[in-house]
Every structure is written in structure tokens, then in C-alpha cells.
Amino acid sequence: MLKSGAIGEIVDVNASVTTLTDEQSEKMDSARFGGSMSENACFPLLPIFKLLGTDYRDVTFYSKMGNGVDLYTKAVFRYDKAVASFQVGLGAKTEGNLVISGTKGYAYVPAPWWKTDYFEIRYEDQNLNKKYFYPFAGEGLRYEIKDFISSVLQGTFQKLSRREIVRMTDVQDCYLKGETVYRI
């Protein structure tokens, strides 16, 4: 639906997955899980890669650190004709929605976007706005997100491609190596 031009050309995708986690949690242990990026980055990468593809030009990270892990990280991707960003946090909270901006309108998926059963297509003229309801099938956050994005794009269910998986690991690797990571 979105790739067919319902919101025009996609120029931006923004997704967030955050939770406030106890500082004593094993998720906050740098030796075990490594913080927000290690715990949650794969989830917001799914809609970004499904909508814009895996051939981004570069990525920059901004992280708030604490106890040796990232409590919050914002990643910004630059594509040839679009940008994308995500926020992940174990020690900071955001709305948790997904917004896909286009040249004619935008798609809004309310928080928590990975569990939602509907999304909205919104335009400058609010009389044209539409809500679409989507019944989830199956279990597992990763599969729900993938199925949701696939159905929005094509009305079909597709598996995560090998290329998408490899590029997700490339993003994690870039972050873990400290490439283009700025501490805030």
C-alpha cells in the first residue's frame, strides 16, 4: 500500500522501542546483553529495511551511556532519497510509535507499533484520513512486525530475507565497533 504511493514518495521512517528497566536487570549487564542496541535494535530495523531497503549510505548513532551499556540510543540512516531513524532504550522512554512520512501524507502506527491491530494513513486534508485494521496471526514480536510490514506493503506475508538479516548484523557490528557512535 505504501510503496504504491498512498502517501507519495517515502522520505522518512521513524520507529522506537523503549522500556524503563531496573538497573540491576541482566539486560543492563554489559557482559551479557550489552544494553539497548543489543536488546532491541533488530525490531525497529525491520520496518526501516522493509520500507527503504538495506542499501543505506551511512548510519550515525547517539548514545546515553550508564554502567557500561547504552541506556538509550538513537540511530540515523541516510539513504539516497530518504532518511530513517530509530530509538531504543532500556533507561529512557519514548512514545513507541512508528511514523512513515511521505510527500503526500504519512502513515501513523500507534504505540506499541509492534503489537498494534491498526494503522492510519493521514493527509493534510483530515477528511481523507483512513484507518486500516489488521488482525495479527502467529506469535513472536519479530514475526508480527515482519508480517505487519509485509501486509502493508504488498498484502502478502513474506519471510525476512538473508540480506535483511545480514544488514541488521552489520548495523549491530558498526555500533559495537564504535563506528560513528557519539555519546550524549
Where on the chain are the PLM-derived regions?
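Short glycine/proline- and acidic residue-enriched helix-loop micro-motifs
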Residues: 31, 128-132
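Active-site loop of classical SDR/Rossmann-like NAD(P)-dependent oxidoreductases
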Residues: 132-146
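C-terminal helix-rich "cap/oligomerization" subdomain common to oxidoreductases
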Residues: 147-184
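Short polybasic amphipathic segments
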Residues: 98, 116-126
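Predominantly a Rossmann-like dinucleotide-binding segment in NAD(P)-dependent oxidoreductases
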Residues: 1-59
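Contiguous beta-strand/loop segments that form the cofactor/metal-binding neighborhood of enzyme cores
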Residues: 39-115, 145-156
